[in-house]
């Protein structure tokens, strides 16, 4: 069999989903946890048009908020915070101990910090003149830590 490396800068959504599925299968097998679930909320106007969404997942006692968006015309009205609060509560209800999110400095790191997230890392110059900030929030303190501080 001959394999070829092919340049593809236009993967389809189905191809990206297939890659993510393979990552999940590998990671789940590696740690013996197959409890991954998508987690998402959408806000729609009275015509059914989506004006905001929060999407991510829970898996192996953690959660990641991968995407948060509110239409520009609806920003500043508390919709992003409502989406974030719903996402956090659902993750907590599923037993996630921690939740993390990445936010550029020109997006919403302040909103996450007001909601109790703490900065864990900041990548300056990502992109040039800006930073990519990783934030994390502890949802459930672990009781089986053998004296190791698990809070963030």
Model segments located where?
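Conserved catalytic-core motifs of GNAT/GCN5-like acyltransferases
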Residues: 100-102, 118-136
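Conserved GNAT acetyl-CoA-binding A-motif
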Residues: 91-104
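Conserved acetyl-CoA pyrophosphate-binding loop and the N-cap/start of the following alpha-helix
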Residues: 74, 78-86
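Conserved beta-hairpin
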Residues: 36-54
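Conserved N-terminal entry element of GNAT/NAT acetyltransferase domains
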Residues: 1-11, 141-152
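Conserved beta-strand in the GNAT
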Residues: 49-57, 62-69
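Conserved active-site tyrosine of GNAT-family acetyltransferases
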Residues: 19, 112, 117
């Amino acid at each position: 069999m001959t394999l070829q490396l092919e340049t593809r800068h236009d993967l389809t959504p189905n191809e990206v989903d297939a890659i993510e599925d393979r990552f999940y299968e590998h990671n789940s097998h590696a740690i013996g946890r197959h409890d991954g679930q998508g987690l998402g909320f959408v806000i729609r106007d009275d015509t059914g048009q989506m004006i905001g969404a929060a999407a991510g997942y829970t898996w192996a006692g953690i959660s990641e908020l991968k995407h948060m968006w509110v239409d520009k015309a609806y920003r500043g009205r508390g919709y992003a915070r409502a989406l974030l609060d719903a996402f956090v509560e659902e993750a907590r209800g599923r037993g996630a101990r921690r939740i993390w999110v990445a936010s550029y400095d020109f997006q919403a790191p302040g909103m996450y910090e007001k909601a109790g997230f703490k900065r864990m890392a900041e990548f300056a110059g990502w992109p040039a003149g800006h930073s990519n900030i990783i934030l994390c929030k502890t949802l459930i303190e672990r009781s089986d830590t053998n004296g190791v501080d698990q809070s963030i």
